[in-house]
Amino acid sequence: MRPSATRALANTFLALLGLGCPHPGAAPTPTAGEPELRVALAVGVQSVVLGGNESGELFVTDDGTGQAVGSIPAGARWIAIPDSATQGAKLRLVRPDGTATEPHTGIALVNVTENRFAMTNARRYRGRINVVAGRAGGGLTVVNRLGIESYLAGVVGPEIGGRRPDELAAVLAQAVVSRTFALGNRGRYESLGFDAYADTRDQVYNGVAVETPQAWDAVRRTAGQVLRYRGEIIDAFFHSTCGFSTAGVEEAFATGRTRPYLRPVSDQYAKGRYYCDISPRFRWREEWDAQKLRAIFTRTLPAVMPIGGDGLQPITDVEVTRTTRSGRVGELRIVFEHGDVRIPGGAVRSILRPEVDRTLSSTAFQLTGTKDGGRLTRLVAAGAGSGHAVGMCQWGAVGRARAGQDHRRILSTYFPGTTLDRIY
């Protein structure tokens, strides 16, 4: 799981049904007992353009009753919009001539031809697309419903990237971890009508376009396999680069309860060498002058403290006051001319940002400050790693694969005490 990210959503969402190509795949044979996953592609959008391509018409059904709503001719475009008469509780489909259908709580784009895929926002997806009104605080919700193995084929590549043949074990490990995470969190957004977001709030999912033979190979070779602890599917966190050691879950998340399988694990294999030292974010450095630091804190500190009408007070110091058991920042103290504020470790990356739109790479860092007249004029952070550091270190997994470790060993190392089980 990557760190949560709140993203601005566009007001218009494009949905097309397009003709698929043989690669990356004619529709795969479903695994027996394979669960379905509902993935939110967009939430709260104000219109969705629906259309068939030049090869054939698009069939649309009522999402609740299954009854036919209409057939969109090849090349035509209909638009789904919230129904004003029901204050957005339902939606209508507007035809090219301006006439509209009766209100529906939701509609489904039916995929009726083999090797064709539902398309939304110019991306192709397996399964079917549902457009639903009246959820998630208004607007329309666009959901892709598909088997979890097909979902994983669109997740593994974006999450761990294309890898060399000698790194395949890392891809297999990613497939297992991503499946475990998805199944362990299925139903988390039940009130919103889906199971997962298609971005870093859960896992990055980009559909058919990012499927590769390598991703499908990893998914098929690990089909149905998940990690369990004492018979229960685990919380399968993962991150880019631990930097030297993974972290306990309670170190990274304010509400994180201790779990025996989510504890610090060293990534060192020799003096001064680490499995993840091949990562471009293995070591990093950030610097702020007084003006930049003030601008950043003016934007980020209101989340944890009030700022008076006169603005932020001059900053006299920024210091680490507590470290965690894995050696990360457990608490950060920001000192002003009159008073201070203490930031818990889980919030540090969002408060001490390198840029307003970019969080700090990790909480594994040391600070050096320069002062003039008692005021902080320059702050430097020298750090290690990228991400929350809990669970599987992706670059560490790649390094371990290069060293000859198979995916079972990689998984048992990063999730000690767990078992690798096939559940369907």
Where are these regions (language model features)?
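Conserved, single-site charged/polar hotspot
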Residues: 2-424
